[in-house]
Amino acid sequence: VRCGIQADIVEEGTTTMPVRRLSSIVRELPDAAIEISVDDSDVATLDCGSSFFKIVGLSAEEFPVVSSPEDKFCYQLDQGTFSEMLQRTAYAASTDETRYVLNGVLLSFKEAKLTMVATDGRRLALIENEVDFPDEAASEMILPSKAVQELIHVLGDEGELRIYSKENQIIFEFGNV
């Protein structure tokens, strides 16, 4: 998940930090400005009021490269519609680790419609919605259950959702996320 926020940047740079640790710290901080500084060994220091934390991160070069959305096919939908489609299919996805190919929701962009399908071998959920996209953008992909649940959690009820896909990567872009 990549999210943009307003910040006063003194010196540009990149690093990575464990998201669970960072979010649990930020969640408990008072509603005030947070100052983040990172040293050469990727140790981040967070200052907020009287609170002070250090988080050991990794170099950004060790993080997997996510290509930019511009070189991918783009599908545009309403966030609420996409979220509802996910909710109506996610329940049927398998949780059996030995059947990993069923541990998600199939997204099929074909014939001017988006079809979502999930099954655990006993239950089957299918939902379709018309979507405009060029014929060369037709594709299918399995969205892992964990990603499905995260999208259901963060998507809003309204607003535009842009889905970029190419080969084995998919990017969901909405608002500042």
Q: How would you name each of these model-derived features?
A:
Residues 1-177:
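Structural preference for solvent-exposed beta-strand-turn elements
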